[in-house]
Amino acid sequence: LHNMEIQAERIIDPRLKTQAVAIISSNHSNGSIISLSSEAKEEGLCRGMKVSLVRKMSHRTQLLPYNQLLYDRINQYVYKTVSSFTPVVEPYMLNEFFLDMAGMDSIYDNIKNVGFSIIKRIKDQISIDGTIGISNNKLVSQIVTAVIPDVVHKINRGHESQFLAPLNPKFLPTVRVKSIQRILKFLLIKQISHIQVIAEQSEEFKILFGIHAKTLSREAKGHDTSKVKSYRYRNHILEQRILPEDTNDKMILYAIVKDLSERISFKLRKR
């Protein structure tokens, strides 16, 4: 569900549909952007930008507080909707879900049509748009939704490496490791295809990327064996807080983490 927060706010207030909108952690000058519309991006804004800088750069952008209750309710509705198509659903983030459709061939003749049905049902009920990526694994399906604008797009088994080849390495999870980023930048590697070629020389690849070599090589080829894990409410406790202002004060952060830990402990004891 791309930019779900922005979509939700525009449903609540249709006047926002053509305006530059940014969701912020707080109105304090030290708050930051959590989500923003395409119009806000055109104003030069980006995620993580401080509110103080936003106010200097753009006077047209509407700044809205993070409405956790609203977003959680939408997320729960979408979870229930996709769960009616398969019993194995894994919520990954607030606006992202993995569905395991293995063994569903006897029920659904065409998985792409199932994807369109899911998107249509969500759109009809709550007016939220989304995209679906279909592939043999979670990694490729997730990348599909990030780079392909189609409502539903499928990568056939065996075509994962070809699909990934022209893409920026930033889409591979292992590339988020700082040391890997530095190596790729030094080697001027700007496409996953370059990683695929280097990975063919296994010894040299291992020397370059060390303990991350095997994982990076698998990801570059579109291999992922991680399973979709069904959501279990009883085994999942979530406590979170949006700070009124960003801070690196260790004492404040420690106190918040301690408070969240105590809340979780209390819930566990009640079980």
Predicted segments with their positions:
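Long, highly charged, low-complexity intrinsically disordered interaction regions
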Residues: 109-171
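Residues that scaffold, gate, or flank divalent-cation-dependent active/transport sites
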Residues: 1-94, 98, 218
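Short beta-strand-to-loop capping motifs
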Residues: 99-103
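Short Gly/Ser/Thr- and Asp/Glu-enriched loop/turn motifs at secondary-structure junctions
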Residues: 92-96, 135-138, 271
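Short acidic, glycine/serine/threonine-rich loops at helix termini
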Residues: 8-10, 34-36, 141-148, 227-232
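Acidic, metal-coordinating catalytic segment for phosphate/diphosphate chemistry
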Residues: 7, 124, 186
